[in-house]
Design a protein with these regions (language model features):
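Core nucleic-acid recognition elements
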Residues: 9, 36-263, 280-286
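Alpha-helix capping and helix-loop boundary segments enriched in small/acidic/polar residues
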Residues: 9-13, 33-36, 98, 102, ...
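Short, surface-exposed, low-complexity cationic segments
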Residues: 14-32, 107-121, 263-270, 732-737
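Terminal amphipathic helices with adjacent charged low-complexity linkers/tails
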Residues: 80-85, 164-196, 428, 514-536, ...
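Catalytic alpha/beta core of large soluble enzyme barrels
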Residues: 217-220, 226, 231-239, 532-536, ...
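Function-dense linear segments that define catalytic or interfacial modules
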Residues: 247, 253, 260-278, 282, ...
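Internal maturation/activation junctions in enzymes
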Residues: 288, 330, 590-613, 639-721, ...
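Polar, glycine-rich mid-to-C-terminal structural blocks
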Residues: 407, 422-495, 499-502
Length: 840
């Protein structure tokens, strides 16, 4: 028996549809009804259809359902059913109008699916049609009509109707897929393999994919693609992917689908795996990325699968105290910036203003003039005009040039001493905070590092903790050393004034960092990176010799350098708002996959400078972080300002840490440990002792690590994720949201931003960052830090009514709680720039 649909098409009769319609009418009134009574009414309708073949249309059947409900005395249900039919009819008419106006019949399927999935009145197609009508003009092209429809859906997004950002993404996805399909047909790209081959020949795809995978493997991998996962993307995320991440041809047309992008990244990151099980890892990585459970850092997301595969986010260099060394560091920065990386530079070894040079007294110009060169390099090397370079410059709080350094970005003072395009950061020892807490009026001595080395025979910056304190006090008491004496109150005033005015300097608590360093047997950590989440061993690059040699008849100058430790950050983030955080077994599996992927980045990466490659291969450091922190709390109805928050995240980060350590150890068993495992805190067990990991479960992990080793010297680092959190449709990094809803202006239109999964239930869980008591954020950071071997991009949010004392108290609390770094101090009246390199 066949039924005629409204559009004239014929389909096979299905009594289940009648049963569902009747059930929904009872659900709408909350009235109970037995299955037998529903079955009886379905039979009556069915009998009518059999007896009246001329009335076998959808409309006639629905009329009969109405009469059947009333015949059984279910008048309220019949009334709601009639209303439902009316609304459905309205929806159909609205969809027909949109499809007719846009002259795009295929669009009807998209809109009907949306209408089925979003049944609330606030997401009616009638509402969309009315908004769309206000943007249409006579004679509009199909392209412009679809643009107008997308704009209409975007502008309907409000706190009361947040799902319009998902609906607008559906229409945007439809438009994008249709354009790509048309392009594929023009080029004859009928399979994924043909497409990869074409993009490789065009220089859009790295040839290494075809060199490592057969045609059969690539086409099998293509079966992993699930187009339904496009529905997970909101408008902002999909728009960002289409504009900045998917591959475009040389005419600027998008040629790569979003799901193909995720698969291409997975194919690249799984390349080092054994051929036999490699496609399994491709699938696992693809699943994590396409489900938005994990985001790779911006360089990895953008450059994987491409010819220029620079996959690392941030780099850190120790600037030596020599002309050759300083200019080498500048060159290193320019190369890193050229390929889209961000930079951290430690200037604590460079002699201060008034220092000696080759015996000439008082002639050194200090660090500021070199930092101005760094600033100019950041502006000049602007990544093909895309954006200028980004760099944080670190200086110790006892360096003689500190007062001028603290005014680098402020608006007052001599402009010749300014560098407005770099980000200053200060390295603090425990002693400074102790003295600040005891008595702000105490004096603090500032020294030249070169003079200390020349007179005392040691480098103060090369030690930490009690040893540093002993040597610093020795310097204070040695009258042979010149110094600048300034009260701690004046230093704090300069720091806080700059923080409120510019958001910087960033904070690096050097003793806290180095005490927790699992690889202290191999070096010092002088500073962090651009976004303050990396903490790894550092050492300056040194020139050993310059020799003139003859090679193949040519005279060449050969410079020999000792490579030092040039830190590299390979980042990814777990999207906490999308993960089963309470299921430890599932978390172990997902963490193991992303740790493997990050470890493979080390082998696959293109390195802008050779020193970075050497350090990365020796330490094999990775930085697994998180995004969606506030999202995860809100969806579980956990308030930010609560002990429940601290307890929950303590458990979550312990779970992530344990999973990451086991994953790295299992990788070491399979592929070998990093070069310096012997003697590390991992090997001796000191890592576990320092963190109080003494449960039976942790003791098993400790034994496993001692037996198998560790593949990676450093594991966890929480980056800001400002861009990639938009892709994942979640909150950025560790930050609380600024607003539940706001409008962002982009190219003349207003883009709505909505807190993830905003609803009546989550609304009050999303308290604004500026309304949150910052002590809760600092305490939470301390709780997490125990489980993070590196550091966190943690911001402080202050309002105009904060006093300097209140801000200082937050710094002191962070130090006491064991927080390693503080990123921006975000004043409500201040807009600070985002780092995109570390956006994982």
């Amino acid at each position: 028996m066949n039924i005629t649909k409204r559009n004239g098409e014929v389909e096979v009769y299905n009594n289940e549809k009648i049963s569902i319609a009747i059930k929904k009418s009872f659900i709408s009134t909350g009235k109970d009804v037995s299955d037998s009574e529903i079955a009886g009414m379905v039979s009556e309708v069915e009998q009518f259809i059999k007896e009246n073949p001329e009335l076998r249309t959808v409309e006639d059947i629905q009329n009969r359902v109405e009469k059947c409900l009333m015949a059984h005395g279910h008048y309220d249900e019949a009334k709601n059913y009639i209303l439902f039919r009316y609304q459905r009819n309205e929806q159909r008419q609205a969809i027909n109008y949109i499809v007719w106006t846009a002259d795009d019949r295929e669009l009807a399927d998209v809109l009907h699916n949306v209408a089925r999935e979003y049944r609330e009145r606030s997401y009616s197609m009638v509402t969309l049609q009315e908004k769309f009508s206000s943007f249409t003009k006579p004679g509009m092209s199909q392209k412009d009509s679809i643009e107008a429809l997308i704009k209409a859906a975007v502008e309907l997004t409000t706190p009361e109707a947040p799902a319009w950002e998902m609906i607008s993404a559906r229409i945007l996805s439809y438009r994008s897929e249709k354009k790509i399909t048309r392009l594929e047909e023009e080029l004859g790209l009928k399979t994924f393999y043909r497409k990869v081959k074409y993009m490789t020949e065009e220089g859009l795809y790295g040839d290494y994919i075809l060199q490592n995978y057969s045609e059969e493997e690539i086409n099998e991998a293509a079966t992993f693609i699930d187009p339904e996962r496009n529905k997970l993307l909101n408008y902002s995320g999909l728009d960002l992917l289409l504009k900045r991440y998917v591959i475009k041809n040389y005419s600027g047309k998008v040629i790569e689908r979003v799901q193909e992008m995720f698969l291409g990244i997975a194919l690249h990151l799984a390349m080092p795996e054994e051929k036999e099980g490699r496609l399994m890892w491709v699938r696992r990585i693809y699943d994590l990325l396409s489900k938005l459970e994990v985001t790779m850092a911006t360089p990895t997301l953008s450059n994987s699968r491409k010819p220029s595969h620079q996959l690392s986010s941030c780099f850190i260099d120790t600037v030596p105290d020599s002309l050759d060394g300083i200019y080498r560091s500048l060159d290193n920065f320019s190369q890193v910036s050229k390929f889209g990386g961000g930079m951290g530079m430690y200037f604590g070894k460079v002699r201060a203003t008034g220092g000696n040079i080759r015996g000439f007294k008082g002639v050194a110009g200090g660090v500021i003039r070199w930092m101005r060169l760094v600033n100019d390099t950041a502006v000049a090397v602007d990544q093909l005009g895309m954006r200028q370079g980004a760099v944080a410059v670190y200086l110790d709080v006892w360096h003689k040039d500190l007062p001028e350094f603290l005014q680098l970005r402020t608006n007052n003072g001599d402009d010749r001493m300014k560098a407005h395009d770099i980000f200053p950061a200060i390295c603090y020892p425990d002693l400074f905070w102790k003295m600040a807490e005891e008595d702000m009026n105490q004096n603090w001595s500032l020294f030249c590092p070169n003079e200390i080395m020349r007179i005392k025979g040691y480098c103060l910056e090369d030690c930490y903790g009690e040893e540093w304190e002993r040597k610093y006090l020795d310097c204070v008491n040695d009258q042979r050393l010149s110094r600048r004496v300034i009260s701690i109150k004046d230093i704090v005033r300069l720091v806080l004034r700059s923080a409120v005015e510019t958001g910087t300097p960033f904070t690096f608590n050097r003793d806290t960092v180095n005490r927790a360093n699992p690889n202290a047997h191999k070096g010092m950590i002088y500073c962090s990176n651009l976004c303050t989440e990396i903490a790894q061993n550092m050492a300056p690059i040194e020139t050993v010799s310059k020799e003139v040699e003859t090679k193949d008849g040519d005279t060449v100058v050969v410079t020999t350098t000792r490579p030092g430790e040039f830190v590299v950050c390979n980042l990814a983030s777990l999207s906490l708002g999308r993960l089963p955080l309470e299921d430890e077994e599932k978390m172990k599996e997902k963490v193991a996959t992303v740790v493997r992927a990050l470890d493979n980045v080390i082998n696959l990466n293109f390195y802008p400078v050779p020193y970075a490659q050497l350090t990365n291969q020796r330490y094999r450091s990775i930085g697994l972080g998180i995004s969606g922190y506030h999202h995860a709390l809100a969806k579980r109805r956990i308030k930010w300002e609560s002990e429940e928050h601290l307890q929950f995240m303590d458990k979550v980060f312990e779970t992530i840490n344990r999973a990451a350590i086991l994953a790295s150890s299992n990788l070491a068993k399979e592929k070998g440990s990093y070069q310096f495992f012997e003697g590390s805190d991992w090997q001796t067990g000191a890592y576990f002792d320092k963190r109080g990991y003494d449960s039976a479960e942790w003791q098993d992990v400790r034994k496993t690590v001692a037996l198998q080793g560790m593949r990676n010297a450093y594991l966890l680092a929480v980056a800001p994720t400002s861009s990639t959190s938009i892709i994942a449709g979640t909150t950025a990094g560790l930050d609380p949201i600024m607003k539940r809803f706001f409008l962002e202006e982009k190219k003349g239109s207003m883009l709505p931003r909505v807190a993830p999964e905003l609803s009546d239930e989550t609304y009050w869980m999303y308290k604004s960052a500026y309304l949150i008591n910052q002590k809760w954020s600092v305490r939470a950071s301390g709780v997490r830090q125990r489980h993070i071997d590196q550091a966190q991009s943690m911001n402080l949010y202050i309002t105009n009514d904060f006093t300097m004392r209140q801000i200082l108290d937050l710094y002191l609390l962070a130090w006491k709680e064991g927080v390693k770094t503080i990123y921006y101090v975000r004043s409500k009246s201040l807009e600070v720039e985002e780092c995109e390199s570390c956006s994982s």
